[in-house]
Amino acid sequence: DVVSPPVCGN
C-alpha cells in the first residue's frame, strides 16, 4: 500500500 510517509514495507 502506498502511504504518505515513506515507511518500510510499501
UniProtKB/Swiss-Prot annotation:
N-glycosylated. The keyword NADP does not apply. Its main location: secreted. Its EC number is 3.4.24.-. Its cofactor is Zn(2+). Residues 5-10 form the Disintegrin domain. It is found in: Secreted. Binds 1 zinc ion per subunit. One of its GO terms (molecular function) is metallopeptidase activity. The proteinase activity is slightly enhanced by Ca(2+) and Mg(2+). Inhibited by EDTA and phenanthroline, but not by PMSF. Keywords: Calcium, Cell adhesion impairing toxin, Disulfide bond, Glycoprotein, Hemostasis impairing toxin, Hydrolase, Metal-binding, Metalloprotease, Platelet aggregation inhibiting toxin, Protease, Secreted, Toxin, Zinc, Zymogen. It comes from the Eukaryota. GO terms for biological process: proteolysis. Expressed by the venom gland. GO terms for cellular component: extracellular region. It is an enzyme of class 3 (hydrolase). Ca(2+) binds at V7, N10. Belongs to the venom metalloproteinase (M12B) family. P-III subfamily. Zinc metalloprotease-disintegrin AAV1: snake venom zinc metalloprotease that binds to the platelet collagen receptor glycoprotein VI (GP6) thus inhibiting collagen- and convulxin- (a GP6 agonist) induced platelet aggregation and the tyrosine phosphorylation of intracellular signaling proteins (LAT, SYK, p76SLP76, PIK3C, and PLCG2) that follows GP6 activation. Interestingly, blocks platelet aggregation but does not affect shape change. Also degrades the Aalpha chain of fibrinogen (FGA), followed by the Bbeta chain (FGB). Disintegrin AAV1-C: 30 kDa fragment of AAV1 autoproteolysed in absence of Ca(2+) that shows more potent inhibition of convulxin-induced platelet aggregation than AAV1. Negative results: does not cleave glycoprotein VI (GP6), gelatin (an irreversibly hydrolyzed form of collagen), fibronectin, prothrombin, and gamma chain of fibrinogen. May not bind to alpha-2/beta-1 integrin (ITGA2/ITGB1). Monomeric (57 kDa), and polymeric (180 kDa) forms have been detected under non-reducing conditions on SDS-PAGE, whereas only one monomeric form is observed under reducing conditions. This is Zinc metalloproteinase-disintegrin-like AAV1. It comes from Deinagkistrodon acutus. The lineage of its organism: Eukaryota, Metazoa, Chordata, Craniata, Vertebrata.
